[in-house]
Amino acid sequence: MIPIDRHLLFLINHEWTHPSLDRALGTLSCLDFWMPLLVLGAVVLVWRRGWVGIACVVVCGMGVLTNETLVAQPLKKWTARPRPYQSEEGIRRVDLAQGRPRLFSIVKPPAVEVVAAPDRRGAGRSFPSAHTLNAMTLGLVLARFLRQRLWWLLPPLMAWSRVYTGSHWPSDVLASLGMGFLLTQTVLWVAWRASRRGVPPFTHAAPFLAPGGARPSLT
């Protein structure tokens, strides 16, 4: 374990904390909360933007599928790196409160537990962070298609949340940000090449896929 990795973990997970951050970052890190909203957002995007919306959803799907099947799951099995709460005492595990549907748990106090002893059950799945990989994909693709740079904030916020909630080491998320950027740029390049060859739905989104195309605005 790199000393600075452990030091940063305890700063973010223990020192730089606040009840409002527990709620905000615990919610951001909870996939069950966001899944119905992601589906709804995809439907609205297709309804509002037509073929361009379909292309955006397809590119996001390609990126997430690439992240999960070619990178995240194979590397998790190969490295078997324990999560912080599996290897360190005193880790704060922060999560959205339990409930069904999870969406309604936003009104409940977040679940915060201090791990007295490492929980070594289960295989280590800390590296890489799939949440961070996929957040990078969504952030870059949505910034490109919606032309809003604010989406660029999603990847670093997700990376922060994964360390804050005790789910990953800082080195996990930093490496995942880099890998996610390279993988997403590759997927965007493949989609752009497909648009040049007349492959639908990418042909309808060529201006958004072209390298050096229209730059997103700040809003």
Predicted features along the sequence, with ranges:
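Short, aromatic-rich membrane-interface segments at the entry and exit
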Residues: L31-M35, V52-C56, Q148-W152, P170-V173
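Transmembrane helix-bundle signature of multi-pass membrane transporters/permeases
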Residues: G61, R92-L96, L177-G178
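Alpha-helical membrane-inserting segments
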Residues: G41, T66, L70-V71, L75, ...
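Interfacial segments of alpha-helical transmembrane regions
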Residues: A42-P74, R147
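Hydrophobic, aromatic-rich transmembrane alpha-helices
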Residues: L37-R48, A135-V141
